[in-house]
């Protein structure tokens, strides 16, 4: 993945600007590794409003359940249908086929305020 248009949160979500007002959201490889084998993902419905820093779903792994937080506010425009049958895609390809949702962003400033890759890697000690 080209990380030029990607930002990160302290909660280990990544947000990729897809052009226009759309962003894709997933979790980082660091988060996927910490969670372990992911067995189920609950996502918001298309058309649902999400609010930055609020839970928008859950990620169930063999050893834990974690909230999925919205890194930006907006409206869900797509969900990854493959995760229903293959939640393990999050572990296998967290920056690619393991994406969670696409959101039409309400305020681009929220995206701009997130960490770049260097800041995120520094936060996780890499």
Regions inferred by a protein language model and the residue ranges of each:
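Conserved protein kinase catalytic core
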Residues: 66, 84, 110
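Short peripheral tails and domain-boundary helices/loops at the edges of structured domains
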Residues: 73-89, 93
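Short, solvent-exposed beta-edge and connector elements
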Residues: 35-40, 62, 71-73
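Short, conserved catalytic or interaction motifs in soluble domains
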Residues: 61-64, 81
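Acidic, low-complexity mobile loops and tails
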Residues: 1-55, 88, 92-126
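Conserved hydrophobic positions within beta-strands
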Residues: 12, 59, 68, 73-76
């Amino acid at each position: 993945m080209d990380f030029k248009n990607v930002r990160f949160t302290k909660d280990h979500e990544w947000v990729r600007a897809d052009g226009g007002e759309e962003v894709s959201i997933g979790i980082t490889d660091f988060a996927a590794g910490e969670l372990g084998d992911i067995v189920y993902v609950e996502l918001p419905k298309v058309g649902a409003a999400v609010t930055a820093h609020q839970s928008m779903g859950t990620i169930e792994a063999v050893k834990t359940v974690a909230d999925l937080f919205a890194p930006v506010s907006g409206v869900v425009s797509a969900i990854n249908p493959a995760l229903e049958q293959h939640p393990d895609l999050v572990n296998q390809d967290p920056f690619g086929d393991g994406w969670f949702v696409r959101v039409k962003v309400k305020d681009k400033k929220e995206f701009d305020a997130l960490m770049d890759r260097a800041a995120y890697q520094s936060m996780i000690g890499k």
